[in-house]
């Protein structure tokens, strides 16, 4: 018995602490699934040993104590929690328990709705005016948050229509839609501020601000799900009551449906679960409520929950596990990404053993170490990620995560430029992890323009070991190429000829083909026109590179380090030795570049020349050609069927040219 008492005390202490973190601090340290497991264990233990159950047990409480920073509000009708089911069998048992309670055979109609992952609130309307808003708190007493709730645009300050009770309490969930959450976190990251772990924390933290102006700046939403005070005047159907609230201006989830029996509930569950990732908000399950209010009243309540409702929880999207190691992968663009190797855990419907740690900043932000107990999240098809560390469970032998100084694939130095979050391998033309993409880019039509060298051929050449760097292309022969899939003798000869023809190019094309990070066609053209020769460019300092039009500090450093990386130098020399050449560039006078400093945008269909030809012609005259219209745009060239870019240009008062006007300008 002593072991049972000890476990009961331990469960109570853990649940009280975790509940305090969740409800009061808005900073949970364990996932919901862990809390649910402990609560179920406590309920089973107290069912087997009723003498252990006391009024202070977490099994008869809803949440934590209210924050002392807010005025406390006592709920006239308690805001209870819900019991949970986790399977079809448990759902059927829930329905049978209600029949047993009623002592008669009843066919239940259920009001089914998504279980939003936000913060439960109570809204009190007197004579149709919002006079008070409060959090659920511990179910009996909550915190007054009226001024903050008034800032939520989805919540009406005055009820619409007529017929509402003199005093009406609306209950619902304040939540943060996924899009708003992601945008808010992106803004916080850019400003170097702390980000929220998930939308639920964000909603709770936003609503419990002492300064309502902060709440007003957060993208909060609200769905009503029930009625407290005044509900007795609204008819005998829960679904009908919700629709009455909708008529009075309260928003409802569009997913709320009526279903018959446990089978109908299960079908609703399966449908919502399948669409979970598509919904614009986070949910962690669905809720079933007996629709008939007289049956609700007859079934009544237990200490912490109604007997006539239950939550059907989805597979947890967050779980706890151990971080066993960290490995570093190199992507096709050279990004070095830390990958967490986890003790396998079932989360989000699958067994997860790997999770992304993104970059060094994320590791520092999380404060994660090898050996830590971590919370891993998997939502839909999103790559699993570590969202928090359970620091209280950190072992004494936990080890810091050290970023490599050399590429784990090719051994080249890794670099992280100031202002960038990503660490990258500097061996862009050499690194095996980047090989296929580097060669595809090199041979592309806008680069070296190797006709017939498609992506699938490049992949075969690399997989068979025939090509390791772009320079190897120029030593291929027809016999080697003819051995590839779907490559006959004639096609092989044509490709050899195309590769040979690509030796003759231009300096801007060659620079673009090298795949230097952030160096597009326009920047390559500016570099070529500024330095005139490859030798001069290779000798340039960062300061000299900054003198080039549209080259900032980041691009200058990318170019500088790329041209000094030993492996890249080897490939560069091999390319020149293979006979790649271009005509000399003559220094252009200012009179030859009438569009210098001007930004053009092309839109619609051009009939007399291709988009690329028009772009090249404008760039040759000194213009910058951008892809989108902004206040910095000088001229929009509008071809046939010009769309939104033309509308925006007209709104901004930007000069608009027809194709005919473009031709006249190009001809001088």
From Swiss-Prot:
One of its GO terms (biological process) is DNA replication. SUPFAM superfamilies: BRCT domain, DNA ligase/mRNA capping enzyme, catalytic domain, Nucleic acid-binding proteins, RuvA domain 2-like. Zn(2+) binds at residues 407, 410, 425, 431. NAD(+) binds at residues 32-36, 81-82, 113, 136, 173, 289, 313. It comes from the Bacteria. GO terms for molecular function: DNA binding; DNA ligase (NAD+) activity; metal ion binding. One of its GO terms (cellular component) is cytosol. The active site is at residue 115. InterPro entries: BRCT_dom (IPR001357), BRCT_dom_sf (IPR036420), DisA/LigA_HHH (IPR041663), DNA_ligase (IPR001679), DNA_ligase_AS (IPR018239), DNA_ligase_CS (IPR033136), DNAligase_adenylation (IPR013839), DNAligase_N (IPR013840). NCBIfam families: dnlj, PRK07956.1. Belongs to the NAD-dependent DNA ligase family. LigA subfamily. This is DNA ligase. The gene is ligA.
């Amino acid at each position: 018995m002593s072991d049972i008492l000890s476990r009961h005390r331990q469960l109570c202490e853990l649940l009280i602490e975790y509940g305090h973190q969740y409800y009061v601090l808005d900073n949970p340290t364990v996932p919901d699934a862990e809390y649910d497991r402990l609560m179920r264990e406590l309920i089973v233990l107290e069912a087997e040993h009723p003498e252990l159950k006391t009024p202070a047990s977490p099994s008869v409480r809803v949440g934590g104590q209210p924050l002392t920073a807010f005025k406390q509000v006592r709920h006239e009708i308690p805001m209870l929690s819900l019991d949970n089911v986790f399977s079809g069998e448990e759902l059927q048992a829930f329905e049978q328990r209600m029949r047993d309670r009623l002592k008669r055979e009843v066919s239940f109609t259920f009001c089914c709705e998504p279980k939003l992952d936000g913060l439960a609130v109570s809204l009190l309307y007197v004579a149709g005016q919002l006079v008070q808003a409060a959090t659920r708190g511990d179910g009996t007493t909550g915190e007054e948050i009226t001024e903050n709730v008034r800032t939520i645009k989805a919540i009406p300050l005055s009820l619409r229509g007529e017929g509402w009770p003199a005093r009406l309490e609306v209950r619902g969930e304040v939540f943060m839609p996924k899009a708003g959450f992601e945008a808010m976190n992106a803004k916080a990251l850019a400003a170097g501020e702390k980000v929220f772990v998930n939308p639920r924390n964000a909603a709770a933290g936003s609503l419990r601000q002492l300064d309502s102006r902060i709440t007003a700046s957060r993208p909060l939403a609200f769905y009503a799900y029930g009625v407290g005070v005044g509900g007795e005047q609204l008819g005998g159907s829960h679904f009908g009551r919700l629709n009455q609230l909708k008529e009075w201006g309260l928003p409802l989830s569009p997913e709320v449906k009526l279903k018959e029996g446990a089978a109908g509930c299960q079908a609703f569950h399966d449908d919502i679960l399948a669409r979970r990732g598509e919904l614009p908000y986070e949910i962690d399950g669905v809720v079933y409520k007996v629709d008939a209010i007289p049956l609700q009243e007859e079934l009544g309540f237990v200490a912490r929950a109604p007997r006539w409702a239950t939550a059907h929880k989805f597979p947890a999207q967050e779980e706890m596990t151990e971080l066993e190691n960290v490995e570093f992968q190199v992507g096709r663009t050279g990004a070095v990404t830390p990958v967490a190797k986890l003790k396998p855990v079932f989360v989000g419907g699958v067994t997860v053993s790997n999770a992304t740690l993104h970059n060094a900043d994320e590791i520092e932000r999380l404060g994660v170490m090898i050996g830590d107990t971590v919370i891993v999240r998997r939502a839909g098809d999103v790559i699993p990620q570590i969202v928090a560390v359970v620091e209280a469970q950190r072992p004494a032998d936990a080890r810091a995560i050290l970023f490599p100084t050399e590429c784990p694939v090719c051994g080249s130095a890794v670099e992280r430029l100031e202002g960038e979050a990503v660490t990258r391998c500097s061996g862009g033309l050499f690194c095996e992890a980047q090989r296929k993409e580097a060669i595809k880019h090199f041979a592309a039509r806008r680069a070296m323009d190797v006709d017939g060298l498609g992506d699938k051929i490049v992949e075969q050449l690399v997989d068979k070991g025939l090509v390791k760097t772009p320079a190897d292309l120029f030593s291929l022969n027809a016999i080697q190429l003819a051995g590839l899939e779907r490559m006959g003798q004639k096609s092989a000869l044509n490709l050899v000829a195309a590769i040979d023809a690509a030796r003759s190019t231009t300096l801007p094309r060659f620079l673009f083909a090298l795949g230097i990070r952030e160096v597009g066609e326009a920047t390559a053209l500016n570099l070529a026109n500024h330095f005139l020769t490859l030798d001069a460019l290779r000798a340039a300092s960062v300061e000299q590179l900054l003198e080039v039009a549209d080259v900032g500090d980041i691009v200058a450093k990318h170019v500088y380090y790329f041209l000094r990386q030993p492996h890249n130098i080897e490939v560069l020399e091999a390319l020149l030795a293979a006979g790649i050449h271009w005509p000399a560039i003559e220094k252009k006078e200012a009179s030859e570049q009438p569009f210098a400093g001007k930004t053009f945008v092309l839109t619609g269909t051009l009939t007399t020349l291709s988009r690329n030809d028009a772009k090249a012609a404008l760039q040759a005259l000194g213009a910058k050609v951008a892809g989108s219209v902004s206040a910095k745009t000088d001229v929009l060239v509008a071809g046939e069927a010009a769309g939104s870019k033309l509308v925006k240009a007209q709104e901004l008062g930007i000069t608009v040219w027809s194709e005919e006007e473009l031709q006249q300008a190009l001809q001088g």
